[in-house]
Amino acid sequence: KIKKGDKAFVGSEFFGKMKWIADVNDDIYDPTYTDMLRVAFTSEFGRGKLQDLVALLSGRNFETKQYEDAIAEASFDKLKQGILAFVNKTHFDRITMILRSAGFILSNMIGSQNAINFAYILYLRGRRENVPAAELERMVRRWFAMSMLTGRYSGSPESTFDSDIRQIDSRGVIAYTDSVIPNELPDSFWTGMLPQFMDTSSISSPYFRCYQAAQIKLGDRGFLSRDITVTDLLLNRADVHH
């Protein structure tokens, strides 16, 4: 449809960089246009509010309150780099692989699109800071699980995105995540709060989803089974529903 209906886009460099998406069957991360803008903008500009993107593309100088052509031009250039990083196949494959390696192997196990969006932002920023691959993947997994368990991006996601990315800009991605995660998930969370949160019949509970992910990551067997894993059970159930 795009090839026939949007000749201008097909002729742009963006189409060539993202046409691989047509062959993707993985629905773990199925971003919208807004998700792409949010990740590209936040990771590249160090800001989390999309209204700031509109202002910057208009040439807004936040210090002088004036509008300058040079700022508009630089902002479009910067956004372009962010979008190209977002649609880079290697980057996209890596973030979905990280989610799967954390145990989140099905899309219905992920209740927060913004938790994935910020995980992708962390990944892109970590790459820019030259964080070693193994350390970066571990950090993104831990942050994503923390975001799911605490509902970090469920209330006012833009404000939280903005606060988090500014702290990352100031302190560096590893230092910031290493300080936040134990603060958000202290021992008392695991021993006191989480058992209470798990007392629910809802299978869409983020706590239950994270419990399933932990079982998958640890290779746990199904109840009263020697051979069938939790992974097998969940994948089989997903196949039946499809």
Report the location of each language-model feature.
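Intrinsically disordered, low-complexity N-proximal targeting/linker segments that flank membranes
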Residues: 148-241
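Solvent-exposed functional surfaces
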Residues: 1-188
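Active-site-proximal structural scaffolding
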Residues: 7, 88, 92, 112-115, ...
